[in-house]
Amino acid sequence: MDFKHLTQFKDIIELDKRPVKLDERETFNVSWGIDENYQVGAAISIASILENNKQNKFTFHIIADYLDKEYIELLSQLATKYQTVIKLYHIDSEPLKALPQSNIWPVSIYYRLLSFDYFSARLDSLLYLDADIVCKDSLNELIALEFKDEYGAVVIDVDAMQSKSAERLCNEDFNGSYFNSGVMYINLREWLKQRLTEKFFDLLSDESIIKKLKYPDQDILNLMFLHHAKILPRKYNCIYTIKSEFEEKNSEYYTRFINDDTVFIHYTGITKPWHDWANYASADYFRNIYNISPWRNIPYKKAVKKHEYKEKYKHLLYQKKFLDGVFTAIKYNVMKG
């Protein structure tokens, strides 16, 4: 597959509010790949890093298929507040729509791959984060990490993913080493040297591989990185699903996953901390940053899609908001048909 045309950006917007300009290689570079639904997530992810790492110099990169004036203005205010630089890369998603995707795994999952390819010619390393990740502690240890010939540094996925992934990918070596791609610190020198973008698309073009995939980009990245990655401790990708609140019915359950050592909280699942029904202590790590950000006067997101209504009404009933819960359940059933 000719992938070079996939990284042709419609526009690149630089929001540089630093009093002293630095070359990108003199800073720690962090990127996100988003569609419109994850705009606020990426913004608060940036704000959370800055709030917890005020002595470090960063360059932030957002690859997005949708940008509007309000979002750009709010990001500009964020950059001004912290005297940092945020770069926006407006990508045309149409060429990517031929790649495997679903309602749960949209085309934007491939933006991380494109960021690795694009920045491999410009930088030595890059931290990629999913836009549902919040930082709650210092990145000093991660910034100090040095690579040899590893492709990057990753965090092993939750236990429930290990044996299933090994079976699906037909390799027992993944049982205990299958990682979650939401946090990836990439050695871009090795990415370029090993021509990993080409290898990714070679695997994606192999029918025998495609039929094994459940999480398209994550599975392929695991196939590529097996025996070639540094393993980071769990604190760099503490995975928590907010639906656990009504499933476990325990307001302290989240503390099994999020604790004093946690650096990155990864809010997986349908309900995100920016949804208006995510009224839990576990979401406060996001909401506390939100409330001191340029987004603070903008209401949290309402349910729009059917699967959001399905989960929202369960949360509302658990929160004893019975009337709202019943109306939301009715709305869900009408949408379900």
Give the residues covered by each predicted segment.
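Short internal beta-strands
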Residues: F58-Y66, V154-V155
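A glycosyltransferase accessory/donor-loop signature
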Residues: M1-I34, L188-G337
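A short, conserved beta-to-alpha structural element at the edge of catalytic cores
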Residues: G152-D173, N279-S282, W295
